[in-house]
């Protein structure tokens, strides 16, 4: 029994270490096992034009504009004053800064249904404490960029009840013989914003500009449940390398690894539950850049060249900007691979089917809390044969525990003889001390995957269960579920054989207290899953142990 307990403790410890190491790498800290790999083409080479080719005028013209915070350059003296243009749709309230025609504030709104309250979260913002912007401009000459003040084209700024789309247009001043008209198109019920950049050559010579589209964000963390850390930072998706997360720490160390040139994919900023992404037209060649532009400010973007525009002619560059919740099915329909911003970590291959099943169950019951309960019940049913094998092994070990203790006492001065005697006992009684370990090992990845499913799913946000649980993404306000969790763990320890080692016995008694303290701050949906899982495990163990006990009694009576 001691050997089995030791193996289970090792498995538990290694699982915890792997989860911690995954969190370390997701937050820019060095891995305990894997060295950081430096990309062959660094971000600075891709964006700043430094190096062998950076000395020529073309590279200088294509350098990204400064003034990362959106302030006007010091050289622009009496310039037009920038204004904030407020707008609203059925899913957004926001502000567009006429300096650059930049999307400077965007609040996602979700109306309640009478049972649930209205929900809102601010994604883009530009305040003294937080910066998160979506902006565009031109490169390749002294052309309009995000530092220039645009003029708003007259038109409505709210989505009317009888309208399906809202268009907001902004016109730049003429610079370098070029004028830009930037148009945002908002569609009812959609988190995808159309962004059209019309480039007009009003000069006397041809121009060959490039359009840049970028997301600018500081590294301030978003609110997440205590002890539950999720990825925050830029991400790049291409057909070549698929989904590449980039930590702020890797950018700081110039170790960001990502594809720097493609004609497909998207770039994004990812945080818990929500993301933003620029999705250029497929087939259009673009350079990708990720860089640090201030001590706490970063940007990820694309530079897309435009064919030469003759005088009096114009060119249009269209792209889509996603800014919304990480709802998996919705993301799948927007762009290839966009659903990967919903980060399941290293258990994605198991977590995605689990979420699919959870979603199907929710479609039947209409409540995410009950869907969690039913999914846990289904998983326990699937693993019942494995659990039964584990509990049977534990029951058999419990039966011979007195004899094992007697052998340990008898041969305590001779460990070699003690081990030989224990092996002989196992052989005689046909008991495998590791027999209960394999079923547990097989189930661990599934339980960890379900943990990540419940932690990463924005569907839990604002979702009620019963009575006092009004939001499964928040902690239990009265700590009822964590207390039930502690009680269920305590009952489980009582059902298991008491370890012969007093220190180990005290540790097993202390575990329910330690875990319950941690679970006090976990989202209610996660704690609900663990409570249901523990209760079902207790029922399974009680049933199997009682069945085995009855069979043993009948055998003894006969």
Swiss-Prot record:
Subcellular location: Cell inner membrane
Protein family membership: Belongs to the OXA1/ALB3/YidC family. Type 1 subfamily.
The gene coding this protein: yidC
Organism, scientific name: Burkholderia pseudomallei (strain 668)
Topology in membrane: Multi-pass membrane protein
Source species, domain of life: Bacteria
Listed name of the protein: Membrane protein insertase YidC
Segments traversing the membrane: 3-23, 364-384, 438-458, 477-497, 508-528
One function term, GO molecular function aspect: membrane insertase activity
A biological process term (GO) from this entry: protein insertion into membrane
Quaternary data: Interacts with the Sec translocase complex via SecD. Specifically interacts with transmembrane segments of nascent integral membrane proteins during membrane integration.
InterPro entries: Membr_insert_YidC (IPR019998), Membr_insert_YidC_N (IPR028053), YidC/ALB3/OXA1/COX18 (IPR001708), YidC/Oxa/ALB_C (IPR028055), YidC_ALB_C (IPR047196), YidC_periplasmic_sf (IPR038221)
Key words of the record: Cell inner membrane, Cell membrane, Chaperone, Membrane, Protein transport, Transmembrane, Transmembrane helix, Transport
Protein purpose: Required for the insertion and/or proper folding and/or complex formation of integral membrane proteins into the membrane. Involved in integration of membrane proteins that insert both dependently and independently of the Sec translocase complex, as well as at least some lipoproteins. Aids folding of multispanning membrane proteins.
Gene Ontology cellular component list: plasma membrane
Principal cellular location given in the protein's record: membrane
């Amino acid at each position: 029994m001691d050997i089995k307990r030791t193996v289970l403790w090792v498995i538990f410890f290694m699982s915890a270490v792997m989860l911690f190491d995954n969190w370390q790498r997701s937050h820019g800290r060095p891995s305990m096992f894997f060295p950081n790999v430096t990309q062959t083409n660094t971000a600075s080479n891709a964006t700043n034009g430094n190096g062998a080719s950076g000395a020529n005028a073309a590279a200088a013209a294509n350098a990204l504009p400064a003034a990362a915070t959106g302030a006007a350059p010091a050289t622009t003296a009496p310039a037009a004053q920038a204004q904030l243009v407020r707008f609203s749709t059925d899913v957004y309230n926001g502000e567009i800064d006429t300096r650059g025609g930049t999307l400077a504030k965007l609040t996602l709104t979700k109306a309640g249904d009478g049972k649930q309250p209205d929900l809102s979260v601010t994604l883009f913002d530009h305040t003294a404490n937080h910066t998160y912007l979506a902006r565009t401009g031109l490169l390749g000459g002294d052309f309009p960029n995000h530092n220039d003040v645009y003029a708003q084209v007259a038109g409505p700024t709210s989505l009317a009840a009888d309208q399906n789309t809202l268009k907001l247009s902004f016109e730049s001043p003429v610079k370098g013989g070029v004028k830009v008209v930037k148009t945002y198109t908002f569609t009812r019920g959609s988190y995808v914003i159309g962004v059209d950049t019309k480039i007009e050559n009003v000069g006397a010579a041809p121009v060959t500009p490039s359009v840049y589209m970028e997301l600018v964000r500081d590294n301030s963390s978003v609110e997440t449940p205590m002890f539950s850390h999720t990825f925050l930072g830029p991400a790049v998706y291409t057909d070549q390398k698929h989904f590449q997360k980039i930590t702020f720490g890797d950018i700081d160390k110039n170790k960001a690894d990502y594809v720097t040139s493609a004609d497909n994919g998207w770039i994004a900023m990812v945080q818990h539950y929500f993301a933003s992404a620029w999705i250029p037209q497929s087939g259009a060649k673009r350079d990708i850049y990720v860089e640090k532009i201030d001590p706490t400010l970063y940007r990820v973007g694309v530079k897309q060249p435009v064919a030469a525009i003759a005088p009096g002619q114009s060119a249009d560059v269209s792209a889509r900007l996603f800014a919304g919740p990480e709802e998996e099915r919705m993301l799948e329909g927007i762009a290839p691979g966009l659903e990967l911003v919903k980060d399941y970590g290293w258990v994605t291959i198991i977590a995605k089917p689990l979420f699919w099943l959870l979603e199907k169950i929710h479609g039947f019951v209409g409540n995410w809390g009950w869907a969690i309960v039913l999914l846990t019940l289904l998983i326990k049913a699937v693993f019942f044969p494995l659990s039964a094998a584990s509990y049977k092994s534990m029951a058999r070990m419990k039966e011979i525990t007195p004899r094992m203790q007697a052998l340990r006492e008898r041969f305590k001065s001779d460990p070699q003889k003690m081990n030989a005697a224990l092996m002989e006992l196992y052989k005689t009684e046909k008991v495998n001390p590791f027999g209960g370990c394999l079923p547990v090992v097989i189930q661990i990845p599934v339980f960890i995957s379900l943990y990540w499913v419940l932690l990463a799913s924005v569907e839990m946000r604002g979702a009620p269960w019963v009575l006092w649980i009004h939001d499964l993404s928040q902690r239990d306000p009265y700590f009822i579920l964590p207390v039930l969790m502690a009680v269920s763990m305590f009952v489980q320890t009582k059902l298991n054989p008491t370890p012969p080692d007093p220190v180990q016995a005290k540790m097993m008694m202390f575990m329910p207290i330690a875990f319950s303290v941690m679970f006090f701050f976990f989202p209610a949906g996660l704690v609900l899953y663990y409570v249901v899982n523990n209760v079902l495990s207790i029922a399974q163990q009680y049933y199997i142990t009682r069945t085995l006990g009855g069979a043993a009694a009948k055998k003894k009576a006969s």
